[in-house]
Amino acid sequence: MSMFCYQCQEAAGGRGCTVKGVCGKTEDIAKTQDLIIYVVKGIAIYSSQVREIGLNTSEADKFIVESLFSTITNANFDAKALNARVQEGLKIRQSLKDAIIKAGGSYNSKENKSWTSKFLSVLGIKNDKDEKEIHDAAAWAANNPEDFKKKAETVGILATENEDIRSLRELLTYGLKGMAAYLEHANNLGYDEDSIHAFMEKALVATLDDTLSADELTALVLECGKYGVDVMALLDKANTSTYGNPEITKVNIGVRNNPGILISGHDLKDMEELLKQTEGTGVDVYTHSEMLPANYYPAFKKYKHFVGNYGNAWWKQNEEFEAFNGPILMTTNCIVTPKASYKDRMYTTGVTGFEGVKHINASKDGKKDFSEIIEHAKRCSSPKEIEKGEIIGGFAHNQVLALAPQVVDAVKTGAIKRFFVMAGCDGRMKSRNYYTDFAKALPKDTVILTAGCAKYKYNKLDLGDINGIPRVLDAGQCNDSYSLAVIALKLKEVFELEDINELPISYNIAWYEQKAVIVLLALLHLGVKNIHLGPTLPAFLSPNVAKILVENFGIGTISSVDKDIKMFMN
């Protein structure tokens, strides 16, 4: 069976990648990632039961989160690392099974009826005759890459034959992947929430349950949105408690003459460690793409060698990494297949990886030694200037709510007629230029609220301000879409409205990968309707599942700039 992947917006032909991923992943990588998801589901079968009888699940929790994150689009292309993850997962699964037995429980209901009946029901075990047959995800075993390869042939997306059930299972899985990404960042800062792990396990096991109806899976998808809000709130708390609340900041986009390190991705803990370790070395630090919002946090402003932001969204990295001249640290997705001209200057860390690229692991205490990349930087030329000037950002919920009287007054007087939430992702497709044209064409009495790398389509345009309020308010990274929700809920309260949809806010969101999926599900949970997704609707939505989203939530897509602006403004 050939590979099949349709988890990102650029899925080939709007249907799915079957030969090689548009992202660059090979068939082997794609299938190994399928197997990792299968292993994680098997672990969830046991860890949910270990959790139920009160035993420690921290090792399994960490593995599930990191494994889901490692399969996000453009995160990890290292076959050796991915196969090692499969091997580690099988060991963790066995340790959970052993823990159940040691505690006097059983994974077989014949030995212990008291707490395994629920366990068996979610596995699709329908009668006593089948009770000895634990789901294959919890039972299969292998110990080498060749056996993994054979197993991977049988567990891909298309193993679920019913199109609608498959669609709902994948929608749920992609929501979990986005959730895992945000939870991993919070965990790195010492913040966690057991209920989120418990839901992830429940949802993973549910994707194996052939007895669940489409309605039951739909309910789980919507519940996923509830935990999406929870995980974004947790990460917001982790980030702001550790580094302070983002504040209005002018960010330099030019360069200096010192050698530099370019840090990309989302992990602020890595950002902190790099800034600490480069201080006093003569090496400057620049952010790239989704790391731009690090410039908004007070804790990072004390570092004089933190210069600003270099470049644009992730998909332009081939040219921009080449021009940077110094080493690049990828803390998370998005990785584009590196050019030979800079591959030896590229480093990965965390769940990311690319074959032939140096990887920096954390020690047992979670610390990372960046000395190698720092010494590498010292041997490199300073970055080539590709832009100059400044951009402004830092409009997360705390900062915007501090401006609430000014914003509310502008709305009441009619100076601001409408807000447009244009959060989300950027990508390669030329059709995404729609978002630049849309921003340019918006009436002058409108304000864009953004988060995520979608901002790069318009954050360098001169769109002016309204009574001193910039017409583009950048809250931060994609997870900071949470800030936009907090702002909307506060405005609902201020204007004493019954329904969040009564606010003069329209949602025109550009999506790309699985973190955008959890953001969407979170917005749906909060009751937001009439969200428009583009540049295309997800390939993983079957016609019937898409119909559910359209009929119940008013989900739509984009058409032309003029038609859409007219529709939104009316």
UniProtKB/Swiss-Prot annotation:
The modification Cysteine persulfide is found at C425. It catalyses: A + NH4(+) + H2O = hydroxylamine + AH2 + H(+). InterPro entries: HCP/CODH (IPR004137), Hydroxylam_reduct (IPR010048), Prismane-like_a/b-sand (IPR016099), Prismane-like_sf (IPR011254), Prismane_a-bundle (IPR016100). SUPFAM superfamilies: Prismane protein-like. Keywords: 4Fe-4S, Cytoplasm, Iron, Iron-sulfur, Metal-binding, Oxidoreductase. Binds 1 [4Fe-4S] cluster. Binds 1 hybrid [4Fe-2O-2S] cluster. GO terms for molecular function: 4 iron, 4 sulfur cluster binding; hydroxylamine reductase activity; metal ion binding; peroxidase activity. Its cofactor is [4Fe-4S] cluster; hybrid [4Fe-2O-2S] cluster. Its EC number is 1.7.99.1. One of its GO terms (biological process) is response to hydrogen peroxide. The keyword 4Fe-4S applies. [4Fe-4S] cluster binds at C5, C8, C17, C23. Hybrid [4Fe-2O-2S] cluster binds at H266, E290, C334, C425, C453, C478, E513, K515. It is found in: Cytoplasm. One of its GO terms (cellular component) is cytoplasm. Pfam families: Prismane (PF03063). Catalyzes the reduction of hydroxylamine to form NH(3) and H(2)O. Belongs to the HCP family. This is Hydroxylamine reductase. It comes from Clostridium botulinum (strain ATCC 19397 / Type A).
